[in-house]
Amino acid sequence: MINVLFCFFSDEFIDAYINDLQIVKKSTNVSISADNAIIDLIFNYDLTNLRILTVSFNKDTDTLEDDKYIYVGWAEAFPFAILKETGEIVELDWEDPTYIISYMAKDQSSFLDILIEIEKLNQKDVFGSITEKEKKENLKQISIIASGDKYSWFLSNFDNEEI
C-alpha cells in the first residue's frame, strides 16, 4: 500500500522524508543505563538526520548540562531538556531557559514512545491513509502514553480541536 501512496509524491519529497527518519548506529558504544533512553540514543546513534515533526536531537558533543537540566534537543527553535529533579522532558524558552514552555513527557522512555507514535500517525496523515475519526483516536492513545494533559505538547502539530 505504501508504494501506491508514494506514487503521488515526487522522488525529492520521498527522499527527504525518508532521510529525516534515518538513525545510524555509531561504531563505538558508550555504556548507558537503561533508564537514560534519550542519552543512550544520542551517544550511541548518529541522529544528525532524524526529524520527527519539529523535534530533533543534539549531537553527543552538543549535549550540555547545568545544575537543573541536561539539554538533549530542539523542538522548532526551543531547546528541550531532561529536568534533573523529576526526570521529565521539558521544552524551554531559548531566551530564558529557566522558563518551562511545556512539559513533553514524564520520562525519557515515554518521550521516545510518544515520538514513535507521533511519527506513525504523521505518516498516515501525510499519505492520506487515516480518517479524521481515526486520527482523533490515535491522538487519544498518544495522550494515554503521554500520561495526560500535562504532556500534550504534540497536539499543536495536528489540526485538531479537542480530543
Predicted regions and their residues:
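A surface-exposed partner-binding patch
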Residues: 1-86, 145-163
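Mixed-charge (acidic/basic) macromolecular-recognition segments
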Residues: 113-163
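Secondary-structure transition/turn motif
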Residues: 76, 85-86, 92-98, 140-144
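Compact, glycine/acidic-enriched structural inserts
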Residues: 92-126
